Amino acid sequence: MNKFGKYFIFLGIILVIFSFSLLIYNNLKDYQAGKSSKEVLKIIEEDDKQINENIITNVNNLTNKEEKVININNNNYIGTIEIPSLNLKLPIMSDFTYDKLNISPCRYFGSIETKDLVICGHAYRTHFKYLANLEQGDLVIITDFYNNTYIYEVLEIEILKPTDIEEMLSGEFDLTLYTCTSDSKNRITVRCNLISE
């Protein structure tokens, strides 16, 4: 075997190892995100004492309205999101950072009250990976910490570029959910309107 053949075999082995390592890393991050969300949900759903000790009233900087926020592990949550057709229930963080997305979906913009809530989440299996499987008419349920339940209906699903921030935030939709496509080049965007509160 010549020098180039050995070089390409070595390069191929390195690429296989790198790909396998990346797969393990991504699956580990997905697992950790799912575990973190489940722990927070358990506290929210089962531990009333801890919740009552951690409830604070926060003024939403986007709306200047008061909202009930629960602080768990130094992160503020505004409620939960449930998508029955995906068998998914997750806590919602009150604000967005990339680090917080590793724990749960985050409010990116707006509020329930102003009917312009935008929630983003990673495309982890345990978070928003399957948003593209939603269909028109599917339900999305958000519950806040005043125990108000808001039921939304999926109206449309669209694909936006990551730079289409203005389009993401515009429109006459009461709720928008979004996550990355599997290749991370675009955003799966689910538009919903409130049908019951």
Give names to the regions the model predicted.
Residues 6-197:
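Solvent-exposed, non-transmembrane regions of membrane-associated and secreted proteins
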Residues 1-5:
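Short, Lys/Arg-rich N-terminal segment immediately upstream of the first membrane anchor
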